[in-house]
Amino acid sequence: MRVLLICLLLGLAPLAGAETFTVGVELQPYMPYSSVVEGHYVGYGRDLLDAFAAQQGHVFVYQPLPVRRLLNDFLNGRLDFKYPDNPRWNADKKQAYKVYFSQAAAPAIDGVLVKPQFLGQGKERLRRLGTQRGFTPWPYLDDIKAGKILLIQANQIDSLLAMALNDRVDGVYLNPQVVQHQLYNSTKTESLVFDPSLAHQDDYYFLSTLNHPEVIEQFDAFLINQAELVQTLKDRHGISNPLTGH
């Protein structure tokens, strides 16, 4: 796997001004985007950031942390960068800070996955909606606040999938590509499917910083100038928008 990446990077010329930075990343498994295996950060996020660092001559040291601590350490200045991030995530806690965000580094859709026999049956049957703790099902907040939908949270994605497969929830609000990756590895590939007719959030993942906007500018230029490499990494990891395939 790494051999392919090295070959791709042969055409990238490192630039002057190399530095070492600490990048805070999520400890939770979220493949194909990212995971932590035996203490090592892996996945699309790792390969993308490594490719950028190689071009610039920077050194990225990855610090996997639980989601809540990751945000706190980032805002308290203990990390140089946070990935992934999004301007909407914990926006209230970020209000007092000047956070610099990159251009979109990866597409991400959060939506509802249901059993195939329930595909296209509408929001009315969603009485119990499962999601991962820390996730916000934005399109369904009004219904949750009104008591029309009961939100059930779990720490682990596999726990949520088990709930859906055992009809303990009517659907799960997650990233479809992450769910399909988990189901593929458990030989239950078609047991839950993304329902595009239900409300979903079409979004992106970004790199963020408090103190290094110049590196964010470098990263933005990398995403543009090395678009072919970035797309190769997306294809390699199966990263795409499930609605468009891109």
Language-model-derived ranges and their functions:
Residues 62-126, 133, 137, 196-198:
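Acidic, polar ligand-binding/catalytic clefts
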Residues 28, 39-51, 115-148, 162, ...:
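Bilobed "Venus flytrap"/periplasmic-binding protein-like clamshell domains
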Residues 68-82, 157-178, 185-186:
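Short helices/loops that flank or line small-molecule/ion binding pockets
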Residues 84-95, 170-200:
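A ligand-binding cleft/hinge motif common to bilobed small-molecule-binding domains
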Residues 49-55, 116-131, 135, 205-239:
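Extended ligand-binding regions for polar small-molecule ligands
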Residues 27-29, 106-111, 185-223, 242-246:
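Periplasmic-binding protein-like
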Residues 59, 136-155, 223-246:
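Ligand-binding clefts/hinges and TM-proximal coupling segments of bilobed small-molecule sensing domains
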Residues 19-93, 153-154:
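Extracytoplasmic small-molecule ligand-binding "clamshell" domains
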